[in-house]
């Protein structure tokens, strides 16, 4: 979904590929948790990269946006399929995922899914 985002370079205006996007992995007692922003590069790409760094660790928490609020349900299915095979204990979904997609995640993964928001506090 890079077609709507642009950045200024010395060569002119080009599509933004979000190569500067960040995610944070919190490591504690053989577990890892992932905090991300809107995941423009794809939450599954982020999770795969972090998961490969910590093989054998338990995936405790995913908190972030998946940026699929205007996407077809196919993108939801790709993410849901990945999560089914790499299931965290908790999934905190942020606004850019879209409330309709949040409902699908909640329906698919039940009580492990919560709606995350600015100022929310949760304990690992």
Feature map (PLM): residue ranges:
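A short acidic, often aromatic-flanked loop/helix-cap motif at beta-alpha or helix-coil junctions
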Residues: 119-124
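Cap/insert and terminal regions of metallo-dependent hydrolase folds
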Residues: 12-34, 38-118
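Flexible, acidic/histidine-containing loops and adjacent segments that form or flank the divalent-metal
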Residues: 1-11
